[in-house]
Amino acid sequence: MLTFHNVCSVPSSFWLTGIPGLESLHVWLSIPFGSMYLVAVVGNVTILAVVKIERSLHQPMYFFLCMLAAIDLVLSTSTIPKLLGIFWFGACDIGLDACLGQMFLIHCFATVESGIFLAMAFDRYVAICNPLRHSMVLTYTVVGRLGLVSLLRGVLYIGPLPLMIRLRLPLYKTHVISHSYCEHMAVVALTCGDSRVNNVYGLSIGFLVLILDSVAIAASYVMIFRAVMGLATPEARLKTLGTCASHLCAILIFYVPIAVSSLIHRFGQCVPPPVHTLLANFYLLIPPILNPIVYAVRTKQIRESLLQIPRIEMKIR
């Protein structure tokens, strides 16, 4: 294993340990991780295929759902294949540029996903609070622009992270990253220089995205609940709230693991390193696995489309 204690050097590559402390169990750990990754890929590809084929699903909410599925595929694919390579083949080596690229993809698309959830909250707000104008406000062009803005925001916010590491912190105390992927804080901790700027920027962006998006989503749902409470009958209220159930579940699936993982990473000094790494990997896998399931179970149109899989296969052929 490549370690250079007390010597600062410019690395050409890093060595990922996988799940530190559980190296003897890597082969066995590959079974649940490989299975979960397969479920995530199949689920999200199915969502993309169903929405593409069924014209009745060509609506803003389902276009946002497709964006969510594509993001989840990027997030899971940016880490799990490498993790399985470590588990199965001992492929622990990762080039410096590949490491920084992986870091960018993970943090960028997590930020983009948060932006898509905010756009979906806006869609639900317009659909419930101003339904007559929904088709005029949420046009295909507007939906595309909201997705593009979310992507650009992710690139602008996260782009400086690998650049600052590359330009400000070229020297490293060791080439061994005690993690299964190139997480920002794990890489910065290995550097020899003053990393305070990198740490402050990374934390600031994380809290900025988390707090601002959470507050905006919460505000939209406060207005939604006020509009729902103004409906005449309990049945109408339940039916209207039901249109938000999938989105609310997906929000909880996304933000709760982030909050738990961040709190444990910052303040859980007593938590063993394997738990930190396992939580970080589950955080990138749980939303891609559960989002398609939640929307398939809670959304009638998707359920009905999935029941017509044989007809869909005929169309593809």
Swiss-Prot record:
SUPFAM superfamilies: Family A G protein-coupled receptor-like. Disulfide bonds join 99-192. Residues 1-27, 78-101, 163-199, 262-276 are extracellular. Keywords: Cell membrane, Disulfide bond, G-protein coupled receptor, Membrane, Olfaction, Receptor, Sensory transduction, Transducer, Transmembrane, Transmembrane helix. InterPro entries: GPCR_Rhodpsn (IPR000276), GPCR_Rhodpsn_7TM (IPR017452), Olfact_rcpt (IPR000725), OR51/52/56-like (IPR050402). Its main location: membrane. PROSITE patterns: G_PROTEIN_RECEP_F1_2 (PS50262). Belongs to the G-protein coupled receptor 1 family. This is Olfactory receptor 52M1. It comes from Homo sapiens (Human). The gene is OR52M1.
